[in-house]
Amino acid sequence: MNDELREAMGSAAVAAAKAVDYEGAGTVEFLLAEDGSFHFLEMNTRLQVEHPISECISGLDLVEQQIRVAAGLPLSFSQEDLTIRGHAIEARIYAEDPANGFLPATGPLAMFRPPEGPGIRLDTGVREGDEASIDFDPMLAKLVVHAADRPAAIRRMRRALQDFVLLGATTNIGFLVDVLSKDSFSAGETTTDFIEVNFPDGWHPGCLHSDEGEGMAMHAALAAGGAEHLGLHRRVSASATVDGEGGRGSPYNPFLSLRRNFP
């Protein structure tokens, strides 16, 4: 995304809203072709799930602005007032199983310890002790990072994901770490077939890179200790009978690799 493309997309989005006399918060989506042309996809008459990215790089509270407009008040800024600072990335944390076709997963959020630190933001409606169930959307949280540029934001997001301890329900955190580790992602080659191209055989926990090993081992130990404290280790026999990457012998399964700690 360069300044010229951003200006062109912004103008097209405004024109689309004006064409239907729309007033309020809205998000216009485009598909970007390799030749730099872009094509209208849809317009959502609301703030997009990824609106924290815009808030981070602009310093604006878009939810506040949405409420102001709905109340008949003017925006508190003009287009000329807007400046972009740094780069932001958002990762959706889902209760889902990337190794099983990204099917939704259920289970207790027995341990929910999000990362903290400069440039890290978490938007969530869950807390430790809640349950990921079939009654609600499987998205648990939105993890957002802000840094000076894209490479720094990628590094910050990887570290934040590695520091995210979530025990009880299967999540996509490991998959997200692997996505961020791909050279193609760093290069901005995030096409609509990114997963098929970069994970042609599907994703599994064994895809984790070696430089994550130490951090994953630390979290495995923490998870095992937390499981023992919460009594979850006594349930493992019912869920650890399947062979494969996520089953017996997996180096990323805290129950099995550290089972010597359990009675």
In which residue ranges do the predicted regions lie?
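A long amphipathic alpha-helix within ATP-dependent nucleotide-binding catalytic cores
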Residues: 1-32, 160
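Alpha-helix N-cap/helix-initiation motif
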Residues: 2-5, 51-55
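Catalytic cores of soluble metabolic enzymes centered on carboxylation/carboxyl-transfer
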Residues: 13, 31, 52-263
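Conserved metal-phosphate-binding beta-hairpin within the catalytic cores
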Residues: 21-49
